[in-house]
């Protein structure tokens, strides 16, 4: 009997240890870490923060899981500000998760922050997102920050340096090959 209890204790300990080392996920079972692969530029690694922006993260993860972003572009680029991507077919809008819209979100728009783009309507965000190349204090409280680049800011900087037209569209398309989840990291 002692051997059985010892064995069960060992199994339980191993299970708890392995659980603690695993990738952080939401209740959806999908990881909160992603890779944005940008054709001819490289990879941007980011972590998503569902504790701060659960609706936004769930929406973004749903679109990533559906491969919505694959083949789209960073269609709006403003050097020393941000790169914006995800303009595609219309998807449903979500509630904006920021203080001006009555929702607490303490994430700041610092260099590397991922945030949702939107129109003037606070609840008009859907699929378009931007990555801050520089801190953007005005975004705090007015745009739904939901993640942060953990590696690959040099890629963001290279993208932010491409030549653009008068409406901030790149002269040569900057293509998002894919956005995928990082499993087991």
Which role does the model predict for each range below?
Residues 1-2:
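N-terminal secretory signal peptides that target proteins for export/translocation
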Residues 5-9, 13-185:
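Cyclophilin-like peptidyl-prolyl cis-trans isomerases
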């Amino acid at each position: 009997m002692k051997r059985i209890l010892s064995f069960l204790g060992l199994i339980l300990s191993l299970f708890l240890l392995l659980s603690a080392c695993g990738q952080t996920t939401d209740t959806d079972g999908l990881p909160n870490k992603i890779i944005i692969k940008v054709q001819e530029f490289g990879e941007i690694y980011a972590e998503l923060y569902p504790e701060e922006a659960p609706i936004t993260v769930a929406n973004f993860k749903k679109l990533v899981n559906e491969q919505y972003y694959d083949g789209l572009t960073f269609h709006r680029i403003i050097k020393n500000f941000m790169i914006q991507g995800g303009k595609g077919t219309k998807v449903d809008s979500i509630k904006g998760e920021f203080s001006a819209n009555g929702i607490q979100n303490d994430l700041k728009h610092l260099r590397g922050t991922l945030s949702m783009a939107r129109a003037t309507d606070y609840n008009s965000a859907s699929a378009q997102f931007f990555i801050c190349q520089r801190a953007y204090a005005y975004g705090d409280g007015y745009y739904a920050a939901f993640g942060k680049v953990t590696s690959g800011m040099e890629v963001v900087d290279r993208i932010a340096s491409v030549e653009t037209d008068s409406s901030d569209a790149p002269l040569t398309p900057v293509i998002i090959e894919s956005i995928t989840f990082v499993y087991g990291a």
